[in-house]
Amino acid sequence: MKTDLIIIGSGPGGYNTACHAAKNGLNTIIFEDRQAGGTCLNRGCIPTKTLCHEADMIEAVATMTGSRPEVDFNKAMTRKEQVTAQLREGVEGLMKSPGITFIKERASFKDSKTIIAGGEEYTADNIIIATGSESKLPPIEGIDEEGVVTSTE
């Protein structure tokens, strides 16, 4: 399949570029082998900020009442999943815009203008690699002990 632009990765760099390209008349294919939205939305920034917000709310209640409320960890994790799912649905909605084809497959290069994904070949004069980053645990003593929770869990 021939297209104007191929983007590998659907994080903020990928989906914003796809939307901009499509608005400017380029037929764009965007590939993602994981969940739409990339690391920040699914395993990094957003889940972390959601859990931190939950902790801040617990601290605020404790400050106002003078006693620490009972915490339901499973509910906090469910809330984290709800927030990321809602934002991911928004990104998936953007990927349904006219001029954008979203393909949930791992993409690899055959040559400088050809991508192979899901057993199919895709060609474009321009290919953007927007694979972003991976979350990483900081070197903090005890971080690998039981009871430590990361945004990935």
Language-model segments: which ranges?
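Glycine-rich flavin
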Residues: 2, 19-26, 31-153
